[in-house]
Amino acid sequence: MNIGIAAPKWDKLSPREFLQLQELASYSTRKLQDVLREFSSPSAASTPKCIPDGDIDFDGFRRFLDAFLDCEAPLDLAKHLFVSFLKPNVTQAQLHGRALNQMAAISSTAACAPVTSHTKGSIPNINSIAELMPQCSGGGGGIGGTGGVAGAEGHAQARSSFVDKIHGITDKLHHSLGGHLSHDPSKTGSVHPMLTVTPSPLASGPSMFQASNPARRSVDSSPSHSATNHSQMSRNSSKKSSNSVNCKIDADIKLLARKLSHFDPLTLKVPLKDVVCYLSLLEAGRPEDKLEFMFRLYDTDSNGVLDTAEMDAIVNQMMAVAEYLGWDVSELRPILQEMMVEIDYDADGTVSLDEWQRGGMTTIPLLVLLGVDSTTLKEDGIHVWRLKHFSKPAYCNLCLNMLVGLGKKGLCCVLCKYTVHERCVQHAPASCITTYVKSKKPKCGGDLLHHWVEGNCYGRCSKCRKRIKAYHGITGLTCRWCHMMLHNRCASSVKKECTLGEYSELIVPPTAICPAVLDRQRSVNQAHKKSQMHHHQATHFQITPPDELSCPLLVFVNPKSGGRQGDRILRKFQYMLNPRQVYDLSKGGPKEGLTLFKDLPRFRVICCGGDGTVGWVLEAMDSIELASQPAIGVIPLGTGNDLARCLRWGGGYEGENIPKLMDKFRRASTVMLDRWSIEVTNTPHSDDMRPKVTLHSNMQKVIELSQSVVVDKSLMERFEEIQRQSKQVATSMGTAASSTSIMMASKTETEMETMATMEFGSSTTTTNRTTTTKSISMSTFETQCLQQTLRTAMSSSSSNTSSGSPCNGNQDAETEVDSHAAAAADVREKSVPRRSGETEKQSLETLLLQHKQQMQQQQQQQQQGVTSLAVEEAATATPVGSNQSDNSSQRNKQNNILKQQITLSLDLSDHEDEPKDDGGGAGDGTKSNGNSIPATPATPITPTTPNAASSVLQQQQQQHLQFEQQQKPIKVQSDKDCTVPYNIINNYFSVGVDAAICVKFHLEREKNPHKFNSRMKNKLWYFEYATSETFAASCKNLHESIEIVCDGVALDLANGPHLQGVALLNIPYTHGGSNLWGEHLSQKRIRKSAGPFGKSKKLRAGDKEFSATSFNSVDLSVAIQDFGDRLIEVIGLENCLHMGQVRTGLRASGRRLAQCSEVIIKTKKTFPMQIDGEPWMQMPCTIKVTHKNQVPMLMAPRSEKGRGFFNLLCS
């Protein structure tokens, strides 16, 4: 039967993707418990609440995975991992009628647990099951119901033929389901209650559907044990279902394959706790913590114990991870089965937390699977196991049998190479090496004895020089300390004392290390109390100098450097040296190792990592008082490795043999390296900062001003008509009363004042600038005319008011003021920059209509005022005249105040030195933005109201406050946003284009660290960002915003090609091998022309490369760069292309600017900067670089490949 005709839509996780998942988990710093708590808490606003015991869909699964990995996981990886958790978990509430029968037909190949060796090809089965589920939801009953029996007779023939095809698998499936669904974990048969390892594909791995009985779980077993385990599972069931299952198949089985393409596994859900358990195996941490976390996670009823199903679910995920890690599942399964039997110490059918942790910690393969750290030292004699694949035939040191397997065959101790099977590791003796002695006065003398490990010797005997035949079984002996290999028969002729071999002066023997005395241990505990909180090693050690000629190595390894080769080198050094000489920098830093070696008079430090690792160790050495300053060597594991190139250690570790490297460190010479101190001081912003006028902003203003004077012709005609009507009305009302005319004059004056104060700020801005187009000239001319007209109107109105003349003067002033107000309104509409034609048109029409209505109301009031005035004059006499004189004097004072306010607003517009506001208010009277001025109030304030003058003054004060707020300087950026990564320069410091590339590189690496897992990938990414920066040119015209002073002499950066970057070089190589200072052509010509008897030629004029200034009369063309001369080199970079040309050799060097001992750099804007490859964005500041000190470094010996007879003659 072949139902997998069509290819599945989704594939499971491949081994390559599993390695990628492991790598992503190693980059992450998030804790799985914290991520689960965030997803389970109801306060998480960004993500919906997830129940740990519930199921999640693909979207929730991907959010959880991204949160744990602290980056965006690849989509294909997330899909395939999600599918690996699917399984056909059938429940009574979800299977109806013929869906059960069709599922039973498929169950012969359906095993969808998270990927084991027997779960391949299960996705098509799941697809078929899920596709058939909607069709069966409406018909038939549940499992064992009457609906399935009712339709059995009509399909008897179909059932008969189908059962013949699948060989009775339906009955077996029914038998298994009927017994297991009613199974009670607390009620078991004669078999041990914890031993329920079954091959049922329906109960292995995470569930595909929502299960109504979550306790029904079991472990997918090996195919070789399927028959026995199946019967064993049946015996464990205390009850059997009395119902029968009748198969009803309407469609041919070939139709199942056709429906595969319509099924999408992403519509299903997977259990969240299975996902968490699976990921916890990949998370770094202590095995004890992982065991407790798994226990709490699967203890769904919170009763403090695990039953059989919960135990099986945990082991299920361990089996899935074990296969991807290269385990032989057939070897691991018996170990887990034995553990499940022995873990229940009180035989009560359940496992408590103590029993679970005790059983887990005594199962060595389980500890390796849980992620036990293979680099953490334990007590002497305890092996540090590591799962290993052997390229040559290997034999178990315990059972003496060969390790057989396709993947990783067995466990090997990292420290002594003791090798065992997984099944034998439980009984392996604690025979590992001793790394220290407990007393300074050993009982059996102070000599170190050989530590022999038998078997797996591939080489020649150190005594008889004959090859050791290790292919035929356990034969041969190897000393762990001196690495001497002997035949078994030759071992008796060798002394018992070990000499530590060829590199004895580099190794600290165990006899030289002992626990620290109490007083020192107490001081160390107090000094390192914070650093030791997360470490469980309570004993501190001290080293006694073993010999006057010894110079031991102190090795620091950074496993997270760019090449990701640290773990391998760490294990090799732990085997070649004393393990207490090797430290992992990711676990506490370098202080622990430096504290142990600080009293030694001679030792050397080896940094396995990039340039940042070297800087980290140098910084730690500054904080510790050492008896002597050790020399530092470098094994390049980083991306750039510029310092390693300068010291001849190469641009990257190429897998060279560790003994050869140790020989180079022994023969290396010592040189001095300068270190420079850098001080960065932020520049405070000046109070009178003005916005810089650029060409773009200037053209934008020209466009706005040219649009502001455009007025619709129809609106102009309407305005002129209304103005003519107002003049006629004013002329006809020649008999109006003086009080009424004064009131109207005051009203129009108030309107003019508010309009002028609102709009003269923007219109006078145009006056202060140089007019370049016709539109600007028009605006300026209209503004000047308006100012003159308003002054004339104010003078005439004030004179007419003070004189108290009758109707004629008031009528003229009234007409004049009305026309001026209309003109002000016209220019107001013109001076405001138009946002849209419709808005201006509507606002202007509204203004004209309001003016027309006001004129009509004034005409009616004046007609009523004439009649009332005649009656009052006839009835009143002298008292009325006195009151009128008092009112007129009060009105004169108010008019004088208004005149002063308008004059003040006009005078403010004439001052060019004061800051101006380029933005005007909207024409509709609303506040458009922060720079706009408040619009005119709806009800104008007249001088007859009591608070008229005070209201106008308040408006003026508010406007002045707004102008002051607009001109405040920008808030200074906080120091936290631009933190300098280092205060010491070891390699180089740069500003500009190269730092901009580095900023982009680091931001992308923090977002997607899995894309930067090799040196080649890092260089390709760097090239991509350099290409984009070439076109972006974000740091062009650097000379306009930076000043450089070298030893008191300012450099003229504007002389010559414009620069985009400046770099200060302490070492010759930067950016992964670029020699920016370069070796000039003149030096090459001198070296080639000067023979053994020849004289050097003079430099030609074309060979000289001058700097921007004649810097202290030093000819920079012949200046030689040296990282120990207490001088720093300053070079300029034109662009990214310039850097590439220097890197490829098309150009000799960068632009040499200076060679000095002190540099001061002042920047005027924010620039990208970097120190030794660590970038950041720096606001305007002052940078001072001075010499700090010198440290000894190890220079590798020259390569011997070039030596020979002909090279000797030519040298």
Curated annotation (Swiss-Prot):
SUPFAM superfamilies: Cysteine-rich domain, EF-hand, NAD kinase/diacylglycerol kinase-like. Residues 231-244, 795-805, 931-958 have a biased composition (Low complexity). Keywords: ATP-binding, Calcium, Kinase, Metal-binding, Nucleotide-binding, Repeat, Transferase, Zinc, Zinc-finger. The keyword Isomerase does not apply. A zinc finger (Phorbol-ester/DAG-type) spans 382-432, 449-498. InterPro entries: ATP-NAD_kinase_N, C1-like_sf, C1_DGKbeta-like_rpt1, DAG_kinase_typeI_N, DGK, DGK_typeI_N_sf, Diacylglycerol_kin_accessory, Diacylglycerol_kinase_cat_dom. It catalyses: a 1,2-diacyl-sn-glycerol + ATP = a 1,2-diacyl-sn-glycero-3-phosphate + ADP + H(+). Residues 548-682 form the DAGKc domain. Residues 826-841 have a biased composition (Basic and acidic residues). Residues 286-321, 331-366 form the EF-hand domain. The keyword Nucleotide-binding applies. It comes from the Eukaryota. One of its GO terms (cellular component) is plasma membrane. Ca(2+) 1 binds at D299, D301, N303, E310. One of its GO terms (biological process) is phosphatidic acid biosynthetic process. In 10-11 hours embryos, expression is abundant in a limited number of cells in the procephalic region and in the ventral nerve cord. Predominantly expressed in the adult nervous system and muscle: including compound eyes, brain cortex, fibrillar muscle, and tubular muscle. It is an enzyme of class 2 (transferase). Residues 174-244, 789-841, 874-893, 910-958 are annotated as: Disordered. Belongs to the eukaryotic diacylglycerol kinase family. This is Diacylglycerol kinase 1. It comes from Drosophila melanogaster (Fruit fly). The gene is Dgk.
